[in-house]
Amino acid sequence: MANVIRLRKGLNINLKGRASEQVSKTVVSGEYALVPDGFVGVTPKVVVHEGDYVKAGDALFVNKHYPDVKFSSPVSGQVVAVERGERRKVLCVKVKAEDEQHYQSFDTLDVKAAEGSQVIDLLLKAGLFGYINQLPYAVSTNPTVMPKAIFVSALRDMPLAADFEVELKGNEEAFQTGLTALSRIAKTYLGIGAKQQAAALVNAKNVEVNVFDGPCPAGNVGVQVNHINPVNKGEVVWTVNPSAVIFFGRLFMTGKVDLTRTVAVAGSMVKEPSYVSTLVGTPLSVILDSKLTTNEHVRIINGNPLTGVKSSLNDFLSPCASEVTVIPEGDNVNEILGWIMPRFGQFSTSKSYFSWLCKGKEYDLDARIKGGERHMIMSGEYDKVLPMDIYAEYLIKAIITGDIDRQEQLGIYEVSPEDFAVAEFVDSSKLELQRIVRDGLNVLRKENA
């Protein structure tokens, strides 16, 4: 019987434009790109040149600090560009896909009998190990430091987030194979939602299944770690996106790197929100082709509205994004005395508007923050929506002031920027909490290096 963990703190934000639970089409492009910024904490070193031929699974770049950690091409074809930005920062590596795809061949693995070291070695060779993150610091992990536990969260409850059960259909065997492989490395925990009924989740083998019943951000892997096996100083846990678990399973079963995934195209500015089957690195212009109600005054997001990255049609699907969201930008909206109007269509957490009476209402929110940054108000706002055993407001103050000792005492090793996404949404001070937490983690990582 799965362990049920009930959470009271949090906030569900019901937005218009949720994807219907059907895969509308398969999106294919002539060009793909792998973006290093999609792998947090990685300093890329490109190992290919323009004009080189690569197969799907061949390395495009490696982590400069851990050269064994490779990042593989999603397709076979010719490398057409290595784009760089300021100070020669690698922005992306583009590959022109050939019509008939060819895959680099790797060994298959009997995961039930394999050693943990064999699992890690194969993931490193195939360029998939970089999809594993770690706590503390919420960055791509170091393969030389073994974790005390591994966490996979199959619950996606951010606004307009993709339902993993849709992606799981047809990939059940690969998912279970990936879970079994991870369990050979360390004790593995699978977090699912109370409403998720897929047999591959509820009856998952070789892992400990925990059911999380509560509002967003119950699906955040950091929240689940905090309630099951908290991270103390000197300890490491690995966290894995469930889509990556499927990638791992395919590799062990077939010996090929197949980065096909199901992505939600959602948001109020999308004509018919639905799911599409595509590859990591697909151009957003191809994914959103003929899907937008308008190309003007829209915010395109690589990911969900709270934790995703602002993008454009010229960008590519992030390696870890489960959805592409399009909402109104709000830069063409003029409101007269907006703060004093009844505003039944405006979402409010403080009952400032009568909209709180409309339970279950879907809101069409835009990208405006509706106010400027101001002094931090110690009102307990963060604690109401953050179901973790930490003092969130005091931790944020410690990060801002650079008090590392205080940060450690307040639990910074347990948190990720995404854990503060809902708190950032409700924050009266309009602070960029996720950026503040990321900056704090980066400083701490350098101090402890």
Question: What kind of region is each of these model predictions?
Answer:
Residues 1-47, 62, 212:
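N-terminal, Lys/Arg-enriched amphipathic/low-complexity engagement segments
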Residues 69, 83-449:
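Buried, small/hydrophobic-residue-enriched core segments of structured protein domains
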Residues 68-76:
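Short coil-to-beta-strand transition motifs
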